[in-house]
Amino acid sequence: MLKVLHTGDWHIGSFPGPEVGGQNSRFQDICRCLDFQAMYAEEHRPNLIVVSGDIFHQARVWSDRGLRESRTAIDHIRRLSNVAPTVVLRGTPNHDSEEQFEMLVTAFYGDDSVSVVT
């Protein structure tokens, strides 16, 4: 039986909310949810993982925040791809910018376990 883990609408980003220890607590909540998702994948071992867009909350952000959000996405996609081949689809332009997805394409260039579709 083919098992597919389908996920999307991660909306990685900083949202208005409290800061704890200088960190946006909403961003930390998103990271904890992504960590749970990866643990679920590691436990249930799907044959294929599909990430269907809206990975990022905002398409246009300042460089330091944008780099942190892109690094979070890359690290999480890499963790998922260690479980099963992973297909990443670009979402709506107001969330997933062309530049963000070019960074994902570059990050996973030559990695046969990840396909980024723009």
Stretches with model-predicted labels:
Residues 6-8, 52:
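A secondary-structure boundary/capping signal
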Residues 1-5:
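Extreme N-terminal starter segment of soluble prokaryotic enzymes
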